Structure formats: structure tokens, C-alpha cells
């Protein structure tokens, strides 16, 4: 399923959502592909890919991120510390500039014990029980774990309950979508 892409603008290298910085690059999109089995009720298959109309210029503010591979299992271990960034709300108010958090991976079993969401094997959880979490506006942000080959996008921020309510955030597990991603890249 594709969305009308001409209505979307992508900003790369931006650290402030309300003003344009000298490091910012803006692009119109040529294609936005939503996973064909996305289910808005369960948030299963909550992943989409965006193709830019023109190529981005890689620099100190814009770079690529690695995808997980067969050797990435340790990144998904319970307690492994990963990072997420976004302009989501800070409990109530939007955050400017871009903010980031370090969050531990939480096992799906533990996540299903404490949270109301049904976390499937295509999802993963991260977060702390002290009220530090992603919030409204952070959806779609990458959950990034550091590895020997650089940062790896292990998850995509999908769903959570409120802001800072001692609940885990639920992410689409990128490992389960690698074949779909490859097909989209070459189609």
C-alpha cells in the first residue's frame, strides 16, 4: 500500500522542529510504502518506508544506520541499553530541540506481564519502570543500539500508554521485516 507522497516533506539533519537550521536538508518524497498487513488495532506490522525524490547528502548531521543481521542477537538481549530520539511530548508539552533517551530492551514476556498491549514476536519492548519513556510525537523513531559496526535500527517506535506512566514502549522488531524491506528497496 502506498500513500500519496507529494503531500509529505522529509527534514533531515534538523535538531529543532520549529526553526530551520543550516544543517537541515528538506526533501519531497517520491514513494511512501506502508506494510500491506499493517493492523491499526493491534499495531502489528507497524512499519513504512519513505523514498526521497532526491538523494540526501551525508555529513555530520545526516548519516545512514545499519539494519540488524544474523549476528545482531545480542542487541536484543534483555537489559541491553539502546537509544531513541524524537520531538515527542515531554509528559504534556512538545520538546524543542530534538531530545533523546537511553532505554533498556525488555523481554516480550516481561512486557506482556506489566503492560496492556499484546506484544507479538514481531514486536519488542524497551523502557524503564521509573516513568522515563517515549511519548506522543515520537512514533516512527528508530530504537538504535550500538554495535561494533555502528548504530543498528533494531526497532521502530510504535505504541505506548501515555507519557511517563511506568509502562514500556512497544516497537516493531526490524528483524522480522528485513525481507519486506529488501523487496521494497529493489522494486
What is the predicted role of each segment?
Residues 1-187:
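Extracellular "complement/coagulation-type" protease architecture
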Amino acid at each position: 500500500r502506498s500513500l500519496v507522497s507529494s503531500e509529505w516533506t522529509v527534514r533531515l539533519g534538523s535538531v529543532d522542529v520549529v526553526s530551520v537550521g543550516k544543517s537541515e536538508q528538506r526533501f519531497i518524497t517520491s514513494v511512501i510504502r506502508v506494510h500491506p498487513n499493517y493492523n491499526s488495532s493491534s499495531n502489528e506490522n507497524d512499519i513504512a518506508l519513505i523514498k526521497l525524490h532526491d538523494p540526501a547528502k551525508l555529513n555530520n548531521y545526516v548519516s545512514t544506520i545499519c539494519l540488524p543481521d544474523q549476528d545482531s542477537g545480542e542487541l536484543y538481549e534483555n537489559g541491553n541499553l539502546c537509544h531513541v530520539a524524537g520531538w515527542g511530548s515531554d509528559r504534556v508539552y512538545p520538546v524543542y530541540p530534538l531530545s533523546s533517551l537511553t532505554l533498556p530492551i525488555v523481554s516480550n514476556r516481561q512486557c506482556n506481564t506489566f503492560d496492556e498491549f499484546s506484544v507479538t514476536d514481531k514486536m519488542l519492548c524497551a523502557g524503564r519502570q521509573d516513568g522515563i519513556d517515549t511519548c506522543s510525537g515520537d512514533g516512527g523513531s528508530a530504537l538504535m543500539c550500538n554495535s561494533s559496526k555502528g548504530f543498528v535500527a533494531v526497532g521502530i517506535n510504535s505504541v505506548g500508554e501515555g507519557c511517563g506512566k511506568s509502562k514500556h514502549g512497544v516497537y516493531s522488531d526490524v528483524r522480522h521485516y528485513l525481507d519486506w524491506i529488501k523487496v521494497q528497496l529493489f522494486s
